[in-house]
């Protein structure tokens, strides 16, 4: 887990908070987001003014209304706070509640999370909100691979991302690395849409804090 300093959830628009409040517990000024795995295990993300703790856990924090088959857009993120901060910037995604689902995967996304969400929301287009840095961009690629029942190894050497995929090796400059560039290199097509904050911000949470 890692600490971040920010103004906290009180600065969020009430309409955004209303959409998610059924999946948020509040203790004083702290927002708690409960993650759960398929075995019933739980972990908690904490967000308040001056503190943000995100679990490394195999479960998810999941929000949607209606039946999973109705969902047309599934948004994936490392943290619930990032999801709320994204929706603060793009509240239009909340106008048709049964149309969208949001899942926070914690610091370390896993193949089991990707498979579970693919099965649950079989009709949904996937959107990712992972960090703009290299870790987030690699996570975009891992989600695409896992949803296709595949995997690859990623390694950074100097200014190059070295990829081992289906016994072949590929090299992409760190500065140019993205899901699109990866898919083009290895001939994979996921139809995943990646969302990154504008400017030099690393995440939607960071954008929310600093603007």
Regions found by a protein language model. Give the residues of each.
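TOPRIM fold recognition
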Residues: 95-211
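Basic, glycine-enriched DNA-binding surface that flanks or lies within the catalytic cores of DNA
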Residues: 1-59, 210
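Short hydrophobic beta-strand segments
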Residues: 72-78, 125-130
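Flexible, charged surface loops at secondary-structure boundaries
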Residues: 25-26, 66-71, 119-123
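Catalytic phosphate/metal-binding cores of nucleic-acid and nucleotide-processing enzymes, i.e., regions
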Residues: 54-68, 77, 81-106, 111-112
